């Protein structure tokens, strides 16, 4: 293994959970779902609305859903860029509280662009891209 991932944070949309499960198939790595890294915009396209927590727990028993509420608090009419920036900042602040060093984020392009290019801010702690074939 080129990388030993300590933890995976995954958007609780079905497509990202399936991606994370495929990337880490056969690997012993903890996966935690977190709403802050959901697709943008919330409240517009129904494909971006997550299932209820109870349903997700039944479908994916090996993923930790303890950090999300039963229904997403982010699903409302037409999320704006300011709200996306707030989600991104909240997730960044959350990551600073974690002890893990090698963290994988399985999310969505618009969220990740906001997070990586507008919110990380420390070149010495640059985030490395995680390619499945290097795991």
Residue spans for each PLM region:
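Short beta-strand scaffold positions
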Residues: 10-11, 86, 106-107
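Glycine-rich phosphate-binding loop signature in dinucleotide/nucleotide-binding domains
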Residues: 2-4, 95-101
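Phosphate-coordination/substrate-recognition cap region in phosphate-metabolizing enzymes
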Residues: 2-66
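Active-site signature of alpha/beta-hydrolase-fold catalytic machinery across serine-
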Residues: 22, 114, 118
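A short, acidic, amphipathic alpha-helical segment used as a generic capping/interface helix at domain edges
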Residues: 84-98
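Short glycine/proline- and acidic residue-enriched helix-loop micro-motifs
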Residues: 60-80
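Generic beta-sheet signal
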Residues: 101-109
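Domain-level recognition of soluble alpha/beta enzyme cores
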Residues: 120-135
């Amino acid at each position: 293994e080129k990388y030993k991932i300590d933890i995976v944070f995954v958007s609780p949309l079905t497509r990202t959970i399936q991606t994370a499960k495929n990337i880490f198939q056969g690997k012993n790595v903890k996966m935690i779902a977190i709403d802050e890294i959901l697709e943008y915009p919330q409240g517009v396209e129904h494909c971006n609305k997550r299932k209820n927590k109870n349903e997700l727990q039944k479908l994916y028993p090996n993923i930790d859903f303890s950090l999300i509420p039963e229904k997403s608090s982010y699903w409302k009419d037409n999320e704006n860029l300011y709200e996306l920036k707030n989600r991104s900042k909240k997730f960044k602040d959350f990551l600073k509280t974690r002890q893990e060093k090698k963290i994988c984020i399985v999310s969505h392009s618009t969220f990740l662009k906001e997070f990586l290019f507008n919110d990380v801010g420390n070149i010495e702690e640059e985030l490395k891209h995680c390619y499945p074939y290097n795991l």
